Amino acid sequence: MLRMKVKKKQAAQRQIDIDTDSFKLKDQEEKLQAGRYIVELVSAVLAGREPDAKPEDLPVKAIYRMAKLHNLDCIVYDGMKRIAGEADADLMEEWANRNTICAAQGIMQQREAKNLVKELPARGIRVLPLKGSILKEFYPQTRYRQMADVDILIDRKNMEKAHTVMKELGYKYEGGDSEDTVDKYYKPPCVSIEMHSHLMHYHAENHKKYLDIWERCKEENGVYHMNWDDYYLFLMEHFAKHFNESGSGIRFVLDIYIFLEAKKKELHPEYLKKKQKELGLEAFCREMEEIAYRWFDGRPEIRDSKYETVILLAGIFGIRQWAYAGQQKKYLEKYKNPRIAKGMYLLGRLFPDSDLLLCELSVPPRLAGIDKHLILLFGRL
């Protein structure tokens, strides 16, 4: 019997579409200079060498602010304390205190994460630890990899059960995201947990390509782990998502370098290349890997490309105004008429959870061609 080969549909390669020119940041040149020097400080710490001298016109305070923005307080502090002068003593004392607090937070986060991956499976909830809690172990010191929160994937059907367990463990429910794929919890003094029901939001281009992630994992006592190829693919997918929405910072690029240095011998390049192409990430991965090694493998070489400018300025959470400008540009390209584009953009801001609501409204296939925001507007009315 003849079998026809069916080619998997490949996602279009993603393009940078961040309009950095439409919104200039306050003190943008100083922030760029601080970002460049942070790369130098991090590179020096990783290599165990003395950092190059700080530019004379760059205040230490600007470096401190940008280190916090990029969530790199601890590793940058270890570089900065080697060259700070007497004039910087007060600020460096403040920074040292923050370094201690961040390190303590990291210890508490890891302790809680280990407890959760024990308690949740014991209640019949399978778990897949994500992102930072795994990466921390690959950094020279775990405190260097700071986390805003601990991310854990569970089954959607177990969200309510997990809610009960979290309350029993002393967590307060902080709400969910607009697409109802994340429940957020907080435990004093400083531990935030995000329980994910999906790796990607419903509206994400590659959402369906991660639905089988559980089947691709290895399990041990109810705790699941991705193979390193899939872990790296998701790391890059997550980076690309943030980058294309509003930019994302130095920490993401550092994660790439740290991970590849730790695990590249266990990766399968041909498989990764094939999957990156299917996900539309091939060019993005190639570019970011190249930047990661130029910046952190030896003395940094920064070329100030658009990619690099975005990374140096964006910080860990990106620039809100860049995201708005990018959304408006996409609406204008779609509708051509500026007034219509502006109206549809405003509707989009009113209905950020539109894809989920479309499912809840059971929109029939025959209406698929009608703009979703118009459907939602009348659906809610």
Where are these regions (language model features)?
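Conserved NTP-donor binding/palm subdomain of two-metal-ion nucleotidyltransferases/polymerases, i.e.
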Residues: 2-148, 154-381
